[in-house]
Amino acid sequence: MADKMVRTPKCSRCRNHGFLVPVKGHAGKCRWKQCLCEKCYLISERQKIMAAQKVLKTQAAEEEQEAALCAQGPKQASGAAAAAPAPVPVPAASLRPLSPGTPSGDADPGPEGRAAACFFEQPPRGRNPGPRALQPVLGGRSHVEPSERAAVAMPSLAGPPFGAEAAGSGYPGPLDLRRPMRTVPGPLFTDFVRPLNINPDRALGPEYPGGSSMHPYCPFPLGYLDAPPGVPLQQGFRHVSRSQYQGGGLVSEPGGDFQPSYYLPPPPPPLPPLPPLPPQPQFLPPGYLSALHFLPPPPPPPPPSSFSLTVLFDTDKENTDDQDAEVLSGEPSQPSSQEQSD
């Protein structure tokens, strides 16, 4: 039992920290999984190196398998060509054309000779060759012109003739590739801009005698510049239609102050009518004021009573005392006047 325990693989990180923990069932549960000490760092680097070596081994095995398939491809293609010399229809997209010339000097061999000269070529090595691993290529020179490749890559542009045209022109079978017409090389860049007309008198000035590529600066004619004789000065601008003056929308006026060339903004739209006010609540019932005319007139004041109680205030008392004093002073004056008369 002790020997079995000793031979059981242990966790190296736990062993670095003084613990013996079996690896079985311990994956992802180590307490020192993120430890950065010197020994644990060496363990993590060793694990990275082992993973890289494993990836390299798998890539080498895949390359060996691809090399074996490439070696078997040409053998199978040559055996199939010898067994079936008749032309086999192959899609034009998978054909890689070469020059139709042969070592014997024939200018245009027949379709049988071209079909016999076909063989399958293995494309460049890659991880996934795909369904187009075997591509038939015409025999002869290995050099292919770019124009011929473009013509075969787009068979829809120059399709084979049908009916009487095919019989009259002697169009070959499906494997016979017509020689495409050579395109006339044109300039890389075509200038579609209108030619620039420059006055030779103004092309070069005395300041720059050697600057042939410099264009003069022609300022716009403004109102304060000297105008030639017979031309009125520009004193303002007004906006006119293009039919009156083809040079632009601004023309000069014979006189007047400067006028702005913008339009006044349109008047604002009229305001919508105000909504009617809600009816005010009536505190008096309708017809109440009209009923006031039918009320009886107020009764007349009562007649004065025979017995009246007069209440004299202090001010009234003072007024009565003054009146009594005046009456008393006026009474003795009357006999004196009588005496004077006697």
UniProtKB/Swiss-Prot annotation:
The keyword Ribosomal protein does not apply. This is Doublesex- and mab-3-related transcription factor B1. The gene is DMRTB1. Testis. Residues 331-342 have a biased composition (Low complexity). The keyword Disulfide bond does not apply. Residues 11-58 bind DNA. It is found in: Nucleus. It comes from Homo sapiens (Human). One of its GO terms (molecular function) is metal ion binding. Residues 263-284, 295-305 have a biased composition (Pro residues). Residues 91-131, 245-342 are annotated as: Disordered. The lineage of its organism: Eukaryota, Metazoa, Chordata, Craniata, Vertebrata. Keywords: DNA-binding, Metal-binding, Nucleus, Transcription, Transcription regulation, Zinc. GO terms for cellular component: chromatin; nucleus. It holds the Pfam family DM. GO terms for biological process: regulation of transcription by RNA polymerase II; sex differentiation. Belongs to the DMRT family.
